[in-house]
Amino acid sequence: MSRRCELTAKGPQVGHKVSHSNIKTKRRFLPNLCNVTFISDALGRNVRLRVSTNAIKSVDHNGGLDAYLLKANAATLSPRALELKRAIEKKAAEAAPVAKAS
């Protein structure tokens, strides 16, 4: 399991640990990842993802997982999140009323 957010693609960064005597040694800054269960209204089921705390705030701000995934850039999403996005788009297209030509 990689240390990468499934929604925002945040991953580890590299920097220095600096001692009192200013000696620099390499270290990794790991993202704050949580296993979170989101509710998808369009799919009608729960979805468990490994996301950063920043992504949790973004999902809440956008009004839920469905709205966030519809707005999200496909390049930043994991393969699992891309499958969810496509499934949500498909359900949304089915639910939308078909325009009648008159």
Swiss-Prot record:
Record GO terms (molecular function): structural constituent of ribosome
InterPro entries: Ribosomal_bL28 (IPR026569), Ribosomal_bL28/bL31-like_sf (IPR034704), Ribosomal_bL28_bact-type (IPR001383), Ribosomal_bL28_sf (IPR037147)
Region Disordered, annotated ranges: 1-20
Single GO cellular component term: cytosolic large ribosomal subunit
Pfam families according to UniProt: Ribosomal_L28
GO biological-process terms attached to the record: translation
Keywords linked to the UniProt accession: Ribonucleoprotein, Ribosomal protein
SUPFAM superfamilies: L28p-like (SSF143800)
Domain of life: Bacteria
Family: Belongs to the bacterial ribosomal protein bL28 family.
Protein name, entry field: Large ribosomal subunit protein bL28
Gene: rpmB
